[in-house]
Structure formats: C-alpha cells, structure tokens
Amino acid sequence: MMRRAGSLLVALAVAAGVAGCAPRSSLEELPTGAASTAHEAIPLPPGALLDGAGKQPSMEFVPHGLDWEGSLRPRPSAPDDDPALEQIRERGRLIVGVEQSQYLLSYRDMVRGQLRGFEVELAREIARDLFDDPEAVDFRFVDSASRAELLREGRVDIVIRTMSITPERASKVAFSTPYLKSQVRVLAPIDRGIASMDDLPERTVCVVDRTTLLNIVRTLAPHSPVLRTRSWSDCLMATQQFQADAIIADDAILAGMLAQDPHTDILPDALATQYYAVGIPLEHDSVVRQVNATIERIRSDGTWHRMFQEWLSDSTTDPYPPPLMYREEPNEHE
C-alpha cells in the first residue's frame, strides 16, 4: 500500500486545489448535528444536493440476486455479425469511458502521469486481445449519470466504471459477463460513533447521485438525510469536513477511501450484492462477445487474480471472479 500512498498525496493535493477554486452556490442548510459549528460555513462539493430524510426510492430495491438474462458467449466473428467490432479494429484504438478519481479502481496517478487501477488494467487487457497492444486505448472520463448516454451516442466504445447490472440499465445498455462482485457496506469516520445501521437515523449519509446506490440508501436508511454528490471523492471530502457522517457504497469503492483516509472504518455487515460489468452499446453483439472472450481469458490465465492482488487484496471485495453469466441463445445446443 505504501507505493500507492505516495502518488495519492499528490492527487489529493491537486483535488484540494480544484475544490478550493470552485464557485460558491446557494446550498441547503445541513441538519442539526451533521456538522460542527466550525464546519458549517464550508460549502458542499460542487453540484452536491442535500435531501431531507424520508424521500422515497424511485424503484424497488432487491438486495441480493440478479434479474438479468445474461450476456452473449464468446465466439469467432461471423459474416452476418454487426460491424462494430471491425470498425474498432480498423480505427486501431479502443475508446473506453472510465473514472479518473476512484482510487484502486480507476484513478490518475499524478506522479506517474497515467491512469491506473483494476478497471484501467481490464481496459488494457481488452485492447491487448484486440490489437496485441495493451496501450492501444484512448480513455475518456465519464461520470455516473452520463455512462449510458455516451454509449448510445457512440462517443465511447465501452464503459468500465463500476457499472452494476440492473434490469433498468440492461434495457438501455448491453453488458458483458460480470468482472467483479461487490458488497454494499457502510464507511464512517471512526470518531462519529457509527457501529451499525442502527446508528444511522438522523445522521447524514453520502452517496453519488443517479446511481443504483441512491435507491439502496433511501430504502435502507429512510430516516437519514442524504447528501448526493457527483463523485465518491466528493463523498469522502464531505465526511472529512463533517458535512456527512457516513458513506454507503460498494466495498470495492470503499476500499479506495479506506486507503486514502485511515481515520475511517468499513462496517462488516453486507447490505446488498452488486455485479460490475462492461457497458457496451445495444446491438453491438460482436463487441460484447469480444469483451467476454477477454474476461474468460484473464480468468483462466491468472491475470484476473494478479490484478486483484495488486489492487484489491486489502479490501473486503470477493477475491474470486464472479460466475460467468450467459443467456441461452437460439441454436446453441444444435
């Protein structure tokens, strides 16, 4: 972890400078007890919104299990396949939407001047199989709210950004078989007196807006005000500035926060299960099959386990690849 910490200090310094230059905006007053008097004047992160307790989730939340038909099995390209994969090959570069500040998963290492993390390595492995060159990748930074839109508009070929599979998303985006299984947990500063979900009522919980986790928070913590931010790094900053008391997120995400801030702790209870998959435009079946071929290859040749050991070995994330999830296709058994 020490080799990651050096680059992190520089990254945090840059992030702090950017946040310090952000314009102030009219913000809702924090509820009593969510912040000390000394921190009340600090503005919330740019674009953040604070909801009072009791706001209803927008859709039903299923804590475990996955209502999804599955992905498409890898197979050699056929003449009648869609042209998407061939167009990527002709371009000679894979355009991938990623995060730039999700430590351990996908973040900019300011010392090395490059993107690093588990999801970044997955993108490079896909490029390796496409072009025999893991560096043949152009990264585009995307936020949670724009992932499906950018895929639909063709501005990225694929998205690898902690994109969990849900029925609602699967109606708009094609998914690979999952590459990571994560459990939803609670992270809180050790000085806030939060030891379980029972301590959350009237305490402000932070979550990234327009994610599946927002529904989870509103379902499982109905008596907590909810701070909605643009990024998980903003959530971590909000807890450090006493604008939030806890963060609810996947343990793969929380692992990066814990590494950044040793004055926090992740509670042991798992609240839900999520499966991360590569997002791909609908009807781009050839790309789905190619990505799944890479996921199968890194599972079998030890690459997945090497990536996990390098980036997530200190986390509570499941240390084994999730099961392959494929749908039954016509003529599959003929």
Task: Identify the function of each model-found stretch.
Residues 17-20:
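C-terminal motif of bacterial Sec signal peptides marking the signal peptidase cleavage site
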Residues 36-159:
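Extracytoplasmic small-molecule ligand-binding "clamshell" domains
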Residues 38-79, 211, 278-316:
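Extended ligand-binding regions for polar small-molecule ligands
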Residues 124, 128, 135-199:
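Acidic, polar ligand-binding/catalytic clefts
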Residues 94-98, 116, 197-213:
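Short loop->beta-strand "edge-of-pocket" segments that line small-molecule binding or catalytic clefts
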Residues 98-103, 140-145, 154-166, 190, ...:
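Beta->alpha turn/N-cap motifs
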